[in-house]
């Protein structure tokens, strides 16, 4: 770790259609091999489908789905005197969003629907309804943290 100074977060440009930095980050996470326009069209198509299903605006529906997947606590390995403990720690807000988006994209990629846009729309729809693989992942992480609550005093 460098000792000179803390490097700040890079500013990312908001997405062109909705002007949301969160959505731009989501597009970047979905993007494969630098094909941003493909990733954008997949995300916008999925959001359109999601908005039709939920009856909310695209951005609002996306925000609800993301909120249901965001983890509040996670476990980190900490070595204390020869044994490794899984210590529960609170997740920083930026990391919460990053993890939630990553989990949604991973879950969508594992689904068996026809197109990626449909898979993403279905996963976001499930997340908005508090079900689906991404929500299950969050619950597993929370369960691990709850199970290891006894080691919380090893926090650093």
Swiss-Prot record:
SUPFAM superfamilies: Ribosomal protein S7. It comes from Salmonella typhimurium (strain LT2 / SGSC1412 / ATCC 700720). Part of the 30S ribosomal subunit. Contacts proteins S9 and S11. Binds EngA (AC Q9XCI8). GO terms for biological process: ribosomal small subunit assembly; translation. This is Small ribosomal subunit protein uS7. Keywords: Ribonucleoprotein, Ribosomal protein, RNA-binding, rRNA-binding, tRNA-binding. The lineage of its organism: Bacteria, Pseudomonadati, Pseudomonadota, Gammaproteobacteria, Enterobacterales. Belongs to the universal ribosomal protein uS7 family. One of the primary rRNA binding proteins, it binds directly to 16S rRNA where it nucleates assembly of the head domain of the 30S subunit. Is located at the subunit interface close to the decoding center, probably blocks exit of the E-site tRNA. InterPro entries: Ribosomal_uS7, Ribosomal_uS7_bac/org-type, Ribosomal_uS7_CS, Ribosomal_uS7_dom, Ribosomal_uS7_dom_sf. One of its GO terms (cellular component) is ribosome. One of its GO terms (molecular function) is structural constituent of ribosome. The gene is rpsG.
């Amino acid at each position: 770790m460098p000792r000179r100074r803390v490097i700040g977060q890079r500013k990312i440009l908001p997405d062109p259609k909705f002007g949301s930095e969160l959505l731009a980050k989501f597009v970047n996470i979905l993007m494969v091999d630098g094909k941003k326009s493909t990733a954008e069209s997949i995300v916008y198509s999925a959001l359109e489908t999601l908005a039709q299903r939920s009856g909310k605006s695209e951005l609002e529906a996306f925000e609800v789905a993301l909120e249901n997947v965001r983890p509040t606590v996670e476990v980190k390995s900490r070595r204390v005197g020869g044994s490794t403990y899984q210590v529960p720690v609170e997740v920083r807000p930026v990391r919460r969003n990053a993890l939630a988006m990553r989990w949604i994209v991973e879950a969508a990629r594992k689904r068996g629907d026809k197109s990626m846009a449909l898979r993403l729309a279905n996963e976001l729809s499930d997340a908005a309804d508090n079900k689906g693989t991404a929500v299950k992942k969050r619950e597993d992480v929370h369960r691990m943290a709850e199970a290891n609550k006894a080691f919380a005093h090893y926090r650093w």
